[in-house]
């Protein structure tokens, strides 16, 4: 086994096999793998690709390409090889033997990035569960990847020696994590019930990783969440209050970014977090319109929203980073959309107006009269409904207010009882 000198930034070789994919789609996938490697603090020193009718069952790529890979490892003094598709345990074991350095796949790379990003207890548990589900059937091929001293890409998370040999330990730990996550889910359910009782409207930012969701959240709500030009900068959900032009307030949540071929173990482990989307009243789908693959990113997110059974929730399509877009960009017109930059104040105001218009479509209009001594109802209307006009009618000694409210709320019932009858 080659003695690997740990660097602050690991030298990485990427390997991809083009099977049943168009050239452009395959090139985009390899480019995204390079971005993922950079996010994980790796430096790509070489790339090997091969077009085949099917992958080689024993080594993923053909024998000639394996030899080419071995020579490239020696030439570049690479520390790690990352394959663009999920490897079987036998393939990983054979490739370790041929290469003499650590070998991981796209799934393990993404899990590794998630492990480095998780901050909350729930996020850390979800990542660990996903990693354990991935590792369990592959222990025999993971020896070199997990034994690298000082860690490195692919070793963050549950990399103890015990996990290599003790499957029972892994299963016990998985059961323990699932029990802990169940308690978190129950807490989420109670929180959602409380939120519904308080008639709070929930918006959820969704989108491909690095589309600018955190920047939008910060700029719209004046919050201070992590903003980085990196994939998966946000992992733990963040919720802030957003004040709309009418004065109406809603809750806005940032969510983990989606990505093409998101590992199934990750989707399963993060299901409790992702299912928060299903509780939203409006999805704000953010697309980086400056990215050359924006259409594919948009389709990937729509597909995942459908898989999470959240496609029936109204959506507003936000084409972000308009200040960086090229002439190639053509917006999709099947959904309500806005083209904007998160750093343009006029665009931010236009987005707030768009959000308000979308919410009006889900609410009931009212024009009610509230007596001067019914201050508690007026206060509730100001807090829980979207008021457009408010005037004091001296002849009636009452306030005449006009606006929109959610139908199944106590305040709307009270306002309905006080609807203004025109004389």
From Swiss-Prot:
Pfam families: GTP-bdg_M, GTP-bdg_N, MMR_HSR1. Residues 201-363 form the Hflx-type G domain. Mg(2+) binds at residues 214, 234. It is found in: Cytoplasm. CDD domains: HflX. One of its GO terms (molecular function) is ribosome binding. It comes from the Bacteria. InterPro entries: G_HFLX_dom, GTP-bd, GTP-bd_M, GTPase_HflX, GTPase_HflX_N, GTPase_HflX_N_sf, P-loop_NTPase, Small_GTP-bd. The keyword Nucleotide-binding applies. The keyword Magnesium applies. Keywords: Cytoplasm, GTP-binding, Magnesium, Metal-binding, Nucleotide-binding. Its cofactor is Mg(2+). Its main location: cytoplasm. GO terms for cellular component: cytoplasm. GTP binds at residues 207-214, 232-236, 254-257, 320-323, 341-343. Belongs to the TRAFAC class OBG-HflX-like GTPase superfamily. HflX GTPase family. Monomer. Associates with the 50S ribosomal subunit. GTPase that associates with the 50S ribosomal subunit and may have a role during protein synthesis or ribosome biogenesis. This is GTPase HflX. It comes from Alkalihalophilus pseudofirmus (strain ATCC BAA-2126 / JCM 17055 / OF4) (Bacillus pseudofirmus). The lineage of its organism: Bacteria, Bacillati, Bacillota, Bacilli, Bacillales.
